[in-house]
Structure formats: C-alpha cells, structure tokens
C-alpha cells in the first residue's frame, strides 16, 4: 500500500490574504527588528509636513531610502542615504533573493512604505507578497491590503499623529 499522505507540501494557497492592521508601536518594533530594512517613499512625501517626518524616521532608524517618482529631490540636502529607483523595478528586484540591493550589500528583509497612491502600490506589493519573503509595512494614511502590515484608513491629522508617535518609539 502506498502512503500518499507523507511529504506533503503546500504550493498554493486559496482565498484572500490581507495585511494585518497595526499601530505605531508595532510598526516601530518591526522596523527595529528588521535586519535589512528599506524605506520606500512615493512622490506624496514631498509635502513639507510629510517630508520632515520621513527624514526623521530615516535618521532615527538609520534607514536607507528608495526614493521613487520625483521624491528624490526632497532628500538631496537632508543628510540621508536616498537613492532613486522606479517602484515597479524595485518590486521586481525584491522578488529576487540574489539582488544586491541599492547599496550592494544584498536584498532587504523589510520594506517600509510611505506616500503612494493606494491603487498603485497595491499592484507592486502584490508581487512581493506572493513571490518573496520580504515583509512590507505601510505607514501611510490608507490601508494597503497587499502589505504585510498597514496602518488603517485614517485622517490626515491622525496620520501625522501616528507618524510622530512612530518617530518617538523608534
């Protein structure tokens, strides 16, 4: 008799997997625990009240920044490690475990996402969610269901308060 129940591996999962809603203290813990984090910012970060907070987050947690779209201009004189990359290319590269990263030191284990259009970043994160082991944490004001973890849908004022709390906890 052949035992067909041994050595089973799950190659596919069915159903919808969505991100876990988190608060700033959980986000701070996850960012602090990451071995190779990368802060990925969209063009929405150029608003002064967001840019100041993004710089503080990057400096406090010592995060390299992947500046997408036209966001690099906001970081040029801020004394942070920011490099330009197209967000779709970044999503593709993150699925390759052999990718050397933006600094040549290897792929990243955690990405922190801020200030993208919801419909846009969800498509990019769909690939990383399904084809890599990279964790993604969205700290934007909109709930991003394809991230591993995300802030919920919050108002702009609540978002500023959440980012300030995150900065204090890092």
From Swiss-Prot:
Pfam families: CO_dh (PF02552). GO terms for biological process: methanogenesis, from acetate. Transmembrane segments: none annotated. Keywords: Methanogenesis. It comes from the Archaea. Pathway: One-carbon metabolism; methanogenesis from acetate. The keyword tRNA-binding does not apply. The keyword ATP-binding does not apply. GO terms for molecular function: anaerobic carbon-monoxide dehydrogenase activity. Part of a complex that catalyzes the reversible cleavage of acetyl-CoA, allowing growth on acetate as sole source of carbon and energy. The alpha-epsilon subcomponent functions as a carbon monoxide dehydrogenase. The precise role of the epsilon subunit is unclear; it may have a stabilizing role within the alpha(2)epsilon(2) component and/or be involved in electron transfer to FAD during a potential FAD-mediated CO oxidation. Belongs to the CdhB family. Heterotetramer of two alpha and two epsilon subunits. The ACDS complex is made up of alpha, epsilon, beta, gamma and delta subunits with a probable stoichiometry of (alpha(2)epsilon(2))(4)-beta(8)-(gamma(1)delta(1))(8). This is Acetyl-CoA decarbonylase/synthase complex subunit epsilon 1. It comes from Methanosarcina thermophila. The gene is cdhB1.
